């Protein structure tokens, strides 16, 4: 399965035979389904799986109803609510959507771990969970990673010729910190 920048639902994917086709369903679930099929087919021999979820990259919605439900009415606490000109309502909306996408990833990682348990592979399998970058969730008036977008009611004047006014390149800890968890037998 090779794809990138795909939507959270009904992605166009390339098959192992090199054909592209639209696959109906939620992308996280589809990737996990393929992973579970591979694990089941290879459970009796050594294997390596590299499962790359596209979430929680935007767009975050749609997600399965059970992933959205805990967050749909949430009034999230945001890190810098007093940042000058911050669009607080937009930060809260995006935070709810982001958390729902994270919940989808969490649920699907759980499906993989449950399959390893069910197939008695847990004691012989190393699982590494990591990300490709951190994320700004309103900190410093920004949203996204190191090439963050401003999340202000109005953008400041453009300061650099080659950087759009709505962008804020950064090396803040929130962009750089990469989550990692390892489950070792």
Identify the residue ranges that each predicted region occupies.
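Active-site-proximal cap/lid insertion segments
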Residues: 1-185
